[in-house]
Amino acid sequence: MPITSLEIKDKTFGTRFRGFDPEEVDEFLDIVVRDYEDLVRANHDKNLRIKSLEERLSYFDEIKDSLSQSVLIAQDTAERVKQAAHERSNNIIHQAEQDAQRLLEEAKYKANEILRQATDNAKKVAVETEELKNKSRVFHQRLKSTIESQLAIVESSDWEDILRPTATYLQTSDEAFKEVVSEVLGEPIPAPIEEEPIDMTRQFSQAEMEELQARIEVADKELSEFEAQIKQEVETPTPVVSPQVEEEPLLIQLAQCMKNQK
């Protein structure tokens, strides 16, 4: 067991003859005790410091181990992240290449489809254009034939009979008129003894005005039907037929009118 400063201070020595001076020994012991106490105190402080340093060293060792472990984990994580990023980048590049190839194929297909449709449309337009040209040629030929046929009708000699003056026409048709009137009335028509002059100032009766108005309406209707027939013949050519003068209906109407007046 180590000696303490108190034991040094309380230490007593036996005396002998011609021994050391007790006072000097006590003074020296006091000095030794003081220095020893200082040494013990310093040693204690150093032990405390050493302990503190050892604790700090242990703490730093733990931190070092933790940091080393963290570094290892970080390195491992970084390596795994790097590997995952590399794999992901490769996957992205591969997927992008596949998408680009797919888009390229789709673009080529659509371009070919558009080109095919454009070609088909161009062919269709060309065919339709040719059909329109053929129809135009047919229509032109029909129109030409119709116009020629109408011109032939207009230039026909039959129009001379139609366009003759009324007096001449009535004179040349007198016999036919008499026959029709005789047939309608059921009695022969006597020869006129003397022609009475036509009274241009005579006023028409209400019945005559209505009959005249009815005849005008009938004539307008026949004119409209004739114009419609001409228009239809222009659109759809028909064989050329020479105009025939329909004298009988008009003569019959006149004869009937005369019979009613009687």
Swiss-Prot record:
Q: List where this protein forms a coiled coil.
A: 34-135, 199-236
Q: List Phosphothreonine occurrences by residue.
A: T201
Keywords, A to Z, come to: Cell cycle, Cell division, Cell shape, Coiled coil, Cytoplasm, Phosphoprotein, Septation
InterPro entries assigned to the protein according to its UniProt record, in alphabetical order: DivIVA_domain, DivIVA_fam
Domain of life, per UniProt, equals Bacteria
Kindly indicate whether the keyword Zinc belongs to this entry.
no
Q: Which family does it belong to?
A: Belongs to the DivIVA family.
Function in brief: Appears to have a multifaceted role in controlling cell morphology, completion of cell division and separation, as well as chromosome segregation, through a complex interaction web. Seems to be primarily involved in the formation and maturation of the cell poles.
The protein here is known as Cell division protein DivIVA
Q: Which organism does this sequence originate in?
A: Streptococcus pneumoniae (strain ATCC BAA-255 / R6)
